[in-house]
Amino acid sequence: MNLSALHPNLRVRIAVGFLQRLLDSMVMSFMAIYLAFEYGVAVAGVLVVTVMVLGVVGTLAGGHMSDARGRRRTLLLGETGVCLTFALMAVADSPAWHSPAIVYCGYLVNKFAASFAMPANDAMILDVTTPESRKLVYTINYWSINLALAFGALLGGFLYNGHFTLLLTLAAGGTVVIAAATYFLIAETKPEETEPEETERGQGEPRGSILRDFANGYRLVLQDRAFGRLLVAATLFMSIELQLINYIGVRLARDLPAQNLLSIGSWSVRVDGVEMLGILRAENTVLVVALALVAHLVLRRVPDRVRMYAGAGLFTAGYMVLAVSDTGWVLLVAALVLTVGELMDVPVRQALLADMVPAASRTRYMAVYNLNIRVALVVASLCITIGSVLPPWGMAALYGVFGLVIIWQYHAILTPSAARAELARA
C-alpha cells in the first residue's frame, strides 16, 4: 500500500504522534527526578501516583466525550490544555519565579489533558483505516513512536541538567504546532449514529444525567467478553515488557558480575549490570526502529494466528532468559528474540482490536484498552516485591505463566467457534 493513499487525517496524526511522543519523552521522563529533587523520594512517589490516577480519569472522560461530541473537539481541548500547561510549567520553573508547586500543578493538569485527548487520537486512526491497511498503519505508527521515544530521551538527558526551563519552553512551542495542525488540517471522523438515543443512553431509558450516560457507555464496553480477553492479553504482555525496568533491571544491577562484553586484543568493552541494562534497552529500541517496516514486509503473508502465537511465545521466552542469565551475550541474543516476538505480535493485536471495536463506541473502547498500561505498571512494580521472595527461575516461570495466558486468550478470540460463543454471550 502506498503511503500517499492513506487518509490525510492519518498522515497528519502519525506526524503529530511522533512529535507528541518526542516531547513527552523529552520532558515527562524526567519529572519524577525533578519531583524527587524538590520534595524527596517518598513525597515524589505519592505525587506521581496522583498524576497516574488523574490520567485514568482523563482517559475515561476523553473516551466518553469523543464518542458523544466528536474526535476533533476532544483533540483540540486536550492539546490546548497540554500547550497551556507546558507554558505555565516553563514560566514557573524560570529563575524569575521558580515555583515547584506550580510546576507540579501544571504537570498534573498536563497529564490529564494528554490522557483526555489520547482515546480520540486512537479512535480517529480506526475511523480512517480499513482492515486491509491497519497492519501497515500500526507498524508505521509503532516504528514512529519508538523512534520518537529514543530521540526524546536522548535530548532530555542532555538538556535536563541546567536547561529544564528550556525543555519546557520547547515542549510548549511544539504543542502549539500540534494544536494548530489539529485545528487546520484535521477533519471530524466520528461515524454517524443511526440510533443516537440508544447509543448514548441505552435502549428505552429516559434522558438522564451526564454521569448516567458516562456509566452506561462504559458498562457496555465492560460486558464485551472478546474485548475483555484481548485486554487481559495486552495487560499481561505489557506487564512482561515493563519487567526490564523493574525486576530484571534490579536483578541485573544487583547480581550481574562485571564482564567483558567484547575483547579485541588489548581493547575490551567491560560492563556491569546497570550498563548492561542500558545496552539492552538501547538494543530493543534500535532493533524496533530498524526492523519494524522490514518485519511487516516479511510477515505480511503469515497468518495472524501464527504471528500472534509465535510472537507471544518468542517475546515471553526472551524475557524468561533475561530473568535468569548472567552472561552478556546470552542477554543480547534474548533481547533480539523478544524484539522479534514484539514485532510479530503488536501490529496484529492492534489491528485485531480495531476490527472488534464497534464504530459507535470506539473511543470508549480505546480509553478502557489504554488502561492496560496503568494496570501493567502496578503488576510490574509488584514483581519487584515478588522477586525478593522468588529466585530468578521462579520469576522466569511466572513470566512463562503470563505468556501461556496470553496465548490462551488469543486462542479464545481467534478460534471461530470460540469467537462466536463469546459474541453470543456478549
Predicted features by range, described:
Residues 106-145:
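Cytoplasmic helix-loop-helix junction between adjacent transmembrane helices
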Residues 57-94:
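Conserved MFS/SLC helix-loop-helix module at the cytosolic interface between two early adjacent transmembrane helices
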Residues 68-80, 299-312:
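Cytoplasmic membrane-interface "Motif A"-like loop-to-helix N-cap segments
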Residues 46-64, 282-294:
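Central cavity-lining transmembrane alpha-helices of secondary-active solute carriers
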Residues 18, 98-116, 330-344:
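Hydrophobic core of transmembrane alpha-helices in multi-pass small-molecule transporters
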Residues 80-97, 314-326:
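C-terminal ends and interior cores of transmembrane alpha-helices
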Residues 2-52, 228-233, 237-266:
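Helix-loop boundary and gating motifs at the non-cytosolic
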Residues 1-7, 189-231, 426:
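Juxtamembrane intracellular "pre-TM" segments in multi-pass secondary transporters
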